[in-house]
From Swiss-Prot:
Pfam families: S-AdoMet_synt_C, S-AdoMet_synt_M, S-AdoMet_synt_N. The keyword tRNA processing does not apply. L-methionine binds at E56, Q99, D239, K270. The gene is metK. Belongs to the AdoMet synthase family. This is S-adenosylmethionine synthase. K(+) binds at E43.
């Protein structure tokens, strides 16, 4: 009998790195709304009283980026200097340039089907049977905790909540099956007047209790709520935020490997993003097809080349058929060229700002086509 602990974390929409991710994807969506052929690589930095957007964009349209940045920050909830950041008054610096012609010539081919990868790289996708959405439980519940914090803040139910928050949850496993929750950490920014005792009670009753099933909570479960005792200074006043700094939060919470490429601010010609979505789509369909209870998929690409340079499937001994046979079926069922992925998942749409918080995977929204299991039958029959 094997027992172990596994932990994942998440952060709220008001965390500095997530502010940056949301701004980068807001820029991408705003441009795609007007120009579906645009090439976008937008990075964001946020710090006290300041936002810097930088990167490379190739487009025929114009977007008021300063106004967009301010609206994004205000929607998150930073609307007053008392919170340490105010979207209405912060400085917005624009350092965006044009995409390199050397890159464009390898990506933009005369025939769309020949479109090459925008860069070299390796991407991973993962699925398992721990949750109904075929995601690992630790990252799933970590996301739900900070999402609940945001819901209560936006609704006004807990008016002392502020935008910045973090969660972490540790599960106990026995023979790869969840048997309980060992620890929950939740830190939330708050206004000055709330006491730690009141905050702790409210967080346990209003955030944790509705999200984490009581069957997993026992006398051994430890709760760490605002363990430093005070969290008034938060957001960009407390820490600098950068696009792409929460890549494990964005994916599988450490339960699967990561190729290193971030997602936000990148149009779907960038395989860092589109191929990672495709790898999740493949892995989820493999598990949904009953071919395995755990599946990790690796894809890799070379700049300017359409076909992936490698495809790997690992089912960790849970496969009902050989992993090499699953690879053969994947190649038969999925077109994993950049063009094939974009068409298969309908990625040239302004859908990306929604992905920038609470995880790119495991959220079965209509826009998140990579969460469908519509190719599981084809995998069974291939």
């Amino acid at each position: 009998m094997t027992e172990y602990l596994f932990t994942s974390e998440s952060v709220s929409e008001g965390h500095p790195d997530k502010i940056a991710d949301q701004i980068s994807d807001a820029v991408l969506d705003a441009i795609l709304e007007k120009d579906l052929k645009a090439r976008v690589a937008c990075e964001t930095l946020v710090k006290t009283g300041m936002v810097v957007i930088a990167g490379e964009i190739g487009t025929s349209t114009w977007v008021d980026l300063e106004d967009l940045v301010r609206k994004t920050i205000c929607t998150i909830g930073y609307t007053h200097s008392e919170m340490g950041f105010d979207g209405r008054t912060c400085a917005v610096l624009n350092a965006i340039g044009k995409q390199s012609g050397d890159i464009a010539q390898g990506v933009d081919r005369g025939e769309a089907k020949l479109q090459g990868a925008g860069d070299q790289g390796l991407m991973f996708g993962y699925a398992c049977t721990e949750t109904p959405t075929l995601m690992p439980a630790p990252i799933t519940y970590a996301h739900r905790l900070v999402e609940k914090q945001a819901q209560l803040r936006h609704s006004g139910a807990l008016p002392w909540l502020r935008p910045d928050a973090k969660s972490q949850i540790t599960f106990r496993y026995r023979d790869n099956t969840i048997v309980g929750v060992d620890a929950i950490v939740l830190s939330t920014q708050h206004s000055e007047e709330i006491s730690l005792k009141e905050l702790t009670e409210a967080v346990r009753e209003e955030i944790i209790a509705p999200i984490v099933p009581s069957k997993w909570i026992d006398k051994k479960t430890r709760f760490h709520i605002n363990p430093t005792g005070k969290f008034v200074i938060g957001g960009p006043l407390g820490d600098c935020g950068l696009t792409g700094r929460k890549i494990i939060v964005d994916t599988y919470g450490g339960a699967a490997r990561h190729g290193g490429g971030a997602f936000s601010g990148k149009d779907p010609s960038k395989v860092d993003r589109s191929a990672a979505y495709a790898a999740r789509y493949v892995a989820k369909n493999v598990v949904a097809a009953g071919l395995a209870t755990r599946c990790e998929v690796q894809l890799s690409y070379a700049i300017g080349i359409a076909e992936p340079t490698s495809i790997m499937v690992n089912t960790f001994g849970t496969g009902t058929i050989d992993d090499a046979e699953i690879v053969r079926r994947v190649q038969a069922v999925f077109d994993l060229t950049p063009y094939g992925i974009i068409e298969m998942l309908d990625l040239v749409r302004p859908i990306y700002q929604k992905t920038a918080v609470y995880g790119h995977f495991g959220r079965e929204l209509p826009q998140f086509t990579w969460e469908k299991t519509d190719r599981s039958d084809a995998l069974q029959q291939a």
